[in-house]
Amino acid sequence: MGGSLGTVCTWPTLGWAIEAWGWSAALAACGGVALGWTALWWWVVRDCPATHPWIGEEELKYISERVQTKETAGAKKRLPPYKAILKSTPFWALVILHFGNMWGLFFLLTAGPNFITNVLAFDLGHTGILAALPYLARLILALIFGQIGDLIMKKKWMSKDAIRKGFVPISHILPGLLLAIQTLTGCDVNWAIVLITLSLGLNGASTLTNLQNAHDLAPNFAGTLYGIANCLGSATGFISPIIVGYLTSTHNGLHEWHTIFYIGSSVYIASGIIFWFFGSGDVQSWNDLEETANKRDVVGIENVSFDDVEVDKNDKKDRETR
């Protein structure tokens, strides 16, 4: 949700800054914040809690008791089983679900201000505020959905698989339907803003679907899975602007934007339906692929045939007879 928080902080302020000082000032401000954040990251972040210089004993104990990990100091790092990952149907269902999620994010991030300024006819300063509203809603609802998910897990009301698939209608299906409904509002500014805000806001439930599913499938390789899914999903950042630019190149009106919203709606809904049928919330067998292989390579145990066992039994009977 860091991207949503950044958008909420950036757009309302930069809209006015661009009107006052131009794009160069806005770009310089964003670049400065990014560099400052990078320096802070290198200074603060460590590989694991145990090596962090600022962590207290009580906090470290709390984390250690609640986080299960098989990694130990000096342990050999295992390469991800890429072949098994790429052959995994639940993994590709996750990739598609994440692609749909990223489409919604990048569509409103890149095309939202264009729609608000040129179709709804707002000035740039107000555009920044209005364009940030959907991301503020997403950030708030993500926290709420996260608490709901934790409660469900704690009470064991639903399995992980049921949670992931059960919240897909909220994170993907409903946002897609709301984008389609938005095309019926015409030039009604209030309804357009409300529906777009609610659409992306409900996508905050992605904290219980595509943003968590990589850890469900393979806790040992969750970073790799999410990295692949996010890489492919980020392609929407240049695909959706190309589509918007093509459809609005000759005329930037409601008819063209209706088509754009229908495309976004279709991607949302299709990705959710595919995950329903092919996704999973269970740990996959290839998560412990190397451990399974090692169990077969047992060292120091003598191979004994059934014939040898029979011979030993006969020898024992002879000794008892004597």
What are these regions (language model features)?
Residues 161-209:
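C-terminal transmembrane helical hairpin of 12-TM major facilitator-type secondary transporters
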